[in-house]
Amino acid sequence: GKATQRTYEDGMPKNESTVQDTISYSSGENIKTYGGPEVRLSARYLFTPDFSVKASLNNSYQFLHTLSNNTTVSPIDTWKISDLNIAPQKGYQASLGFYKNFKENEYELSIEGYYKKMEDVLDFKTGANLFLNENVETQILQGDGKAYGVEFLLKKKSGDLNGWLSYTYSRSLYRFDSEFSEE
């Protein structure tokens, strides 16, 4: 449908006083094009019939964002597509896992670690107002992040008693740097 898009002064925070222009787009007109290859590589090496190592690498892009304001109770999420002011989120992930079967495959033990680097992650400014806000880019910050962790899993796959026991340690860190005190 029809849309309008604001442009803001370079090197300034996005707010009412830094609006340079408002561009109108007709239905079906392209506002901004983003793209990129999403590569996925994986490998498995079987050292013995009951021991293997698996590794994977991938990258991804997120062009559509869910904006959920967690500071107030509301069942409404706002959806925002990447545009002139909000870049798509990018992620790069690597993982490495070791898998071992015991007692003729009755038990399986696995240990897997991962690391993920993220760019242009969205977060809200303090006191952000998203409800019926046509210019949500004024309420959003974009930054970088990383996540890493390790997962342990022990499975008992057969017999009268079966199930699994697992433990995951993970950590996510984000940085939203701005040279402007209002952000």
How would you describe each model-predicted region?
Residues 4-13, 66-74, 79, 121-129, ...:
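Outer-membrane beta-barrel translocator domains and adjoining extracellular loop/strand segments
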Residues 12-28, 58-60, 112, 126, ...:
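Feature marks flexible
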Residues 22-30, 78-84, 98, 135-141, ...:
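Extracellular loop and loop/strand-boundary signature of outer-membrane beta-barrel proteins
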Residues 114-117, 136-183:
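Gram-negative outer-membrane beta-barrel transporters
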